[in-house]
Amino acid sequence: QRADFDKLLADQAALQGVDIRYGESVIAADVDAGKPLLTIEREDGSRYQVDADFMLDASGYGRVLPRLLDLEAPSNFPVRQAVFTHVEDRIDCAHFDRNKILVTTHPTQRDIWFWSIPFSNGRTSVGVVAAAEHFAGRSENLDDCLRSFIDETPSLQRVLANAVWDTPARTLSGYSANVKTLHGPGFALLGNAAEFLDPVFSSGVTIAMRSASMAAAVLHRQLQGETVDWQTEFAEPLKRGVDTFRCYVEGWYAGTFQDVIYHPESKPHIRRMISSILAGYAWDETNPFVSEPKRRLRMLSDICATEPA
């Protein structure tokens, strides 16, 4: 499903005039020669070079420039692991909405959560995310491992009771990533190529789109001959929104944000402001939960903890 979506996006970009070259890999990058220079390797082993006035790295989890230019830095997040698959879901629960993503929290270990993303063809992407230590003692068979987590979570088990598990599960570990810098001479990093926080709330999509929009605006001015400052006009404002997301991701795993989300007497206007952030408006400084995320979330969590549920 994701491959079909990615190909659709790529085809639409090609229709707009973008030159997309499949089956080729960037194996070297030189940004010290005035103009960025890339060395490309084709599937048959032949190589060629491409130079440019500027490079934008949108390679996502491939993180091409961070790897080639030694820009990778350790993430501050604990090492977490995801195990996931696609199933023929056969969901017949009356309350299940196929137009929405279902996020489920483990009933006793709140830092374990599941996603269920229904597709239009009767299939669903199902996955679990947990800290590495929660996998200790579980089956090394990924299908059995995933289903053991689901079996411990009755609400999700009911949703997937009729599922046909016909696709081998896969795993991804230590996916959170960071970099030493978001830009350098002749290049800037976009989206997950720069920093990936966590799959919860799908912040990666928002950060990818926002970083691309911001970088394109700065680069356009630079190519027009203006003097620009990539640090103050791109890196710092981008980081403010990323740090807002970081606050809510950290709060999710700590349980404080879950206290807010799951509180039965939540105020509609507060839900709207928080939902706005998760929908992508993490740079809207008029929203108090953006301008002061840590203080506001802590205050709200304290209120939820003292009010009767």
Predicted ranges, named:
Residues H134-V218, Q224-A235:
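FAD/FMN-dependent oxidoreductases across multiple families
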Residues Q109-R110, G122, V128-E133, L142, ...:
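FAD-dependent flavoprotein oxygenase/oxidase catalytic domain
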Residues L65-L68, V200, T206, Y248:
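Short, function-defining helix-loop hinge/capping sites that tune catalysis or transport
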Residues Q1-D4:
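Active-site-adjacent segment of FAD-dependent monooxygenases/related oxidoreductases
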Residues A217-A309:
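C-terminal helical "tail/cap" subdomain of flavin- and related membrane-associated enzymes
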Residues D11-L156, L160:
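Predominantly flavin-linked oxidoreductase catalytic cores and closely associated redox partners
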Residues D70-A73, V126-F135, S202-T206, E265-D284:
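Short secondary-structure transition/capping segments
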Residues K7, A58-S59, A193, P199:
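Generic detector of well-ordered alpha-helical packing
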